[in-house]
Amino acid sequence: MNVKGRVFKYGDNVDTDVIIPARYLNTSNHKELASHCMEDIDKEFVNNVKDGDIIVANKNFGCGSSREHAPIAIKAAGISCVIASTFARIFYRNSINIGLPILECDEAVKNINHGDELEVDFSTGIIKNLSKNEQYQGEAFPEFMQKIIDNDGLIGYIRNK
């Protein structure tokens, strides 16, 4: 599976309280969550994000409270994948479980800028920076995780099994 999109870049330790603030956790409506995604760190995110865009961040993305709402809000906002140097483990698991592709690749994060255009191949882990004509090698998903992503998350995977 390949995705192509424009980059929104963030720093270290972007926590789940910033991704979707606790004041919005009283809803499970995905569109409502998406409308507040990243608003405490990037007020214009929801106005500028387009389907297929990509979040790139430094280390420890998704740290903080364990809430499935965070990857749901990101995915519902139209983000096709998140690339970071490292992820908080619970965010990593929650993302895979809801079908949000995420890749760790420190080299890519160091070289990608806000607004760059990327193409990502999840089967190989290759990240192409089309703006800079560069390529980085991320870690490809193991086959079973790729199947979960391909089925839009763990529930879809089990339903289709």
UniProtKB/Swiss-Prot annotation:
Concerning Gene3D superfamilies, the annotation shows: Aconitase, domain 4 (3.20.19.10)
Family as reported in the entry's similarity comment: Belongs to the LeuD family. LeuD type 2 subfamily.
Q: What pairs make up the disulfide bonds?
A: none
**Which CDD domains does this chain map to?**
IPMI_Swivel
* InterPro entries associated with the record: Aconitase/3IPM_dehydase_swvl, AconitaseA/IPMdHydase_ssu_swvl, IPMI_Swivel, LeuD, LeuD/DmdB_bac, LeuD_type2/HacB/DmdB
Name the Gene Ontology molecular function terms of this record.
Answer: 3-isopropylmalate dehydratase activity
- Its recorded name reads 3-isopropylmalate dehydratase small subunit
Gene this chain is encoded by: leuD
Organism whose genome encodes this protein: Clostridium botulinum (strain Eklund 17B / Type B)
| A single BP term in Gene Ontology | L-leucine biosynthetic process
Q: What does this protein do?
A: Catalyzes the isomerization between 2-isopropylmalate and 3-isopropylmalate, via the formation of 2-isopropylmaleate.
> Assembly state and interactors?
Heterodimer of LeuC and LeuD.
Q: What does the record give as EC number?
A: 4.2.1.33
Q: Which reaction does it catalyse?
A: (2R,3S)-3-isopropylmalate = (2S)-2-isopropylmalate
* Family matches, as NCBIfam families: leud (TIGR02084), LEUD_arch (TIGR02087)
Q: What class of enzyme is it?
A: lyase
Entry superkingdom: Bacteria
User: Which pathway or pathways does this protein act in?
Assistant: Amino-acid biosynthesis; L-leucine biosynthesis; L-leucine from 3-methyl-2-oxobutanoate: step 2/4
Key words of the record: Amino-acid biosynthesis, Branched-chain amino acid biosynthesis, Leucine biosynthesis, Lyase
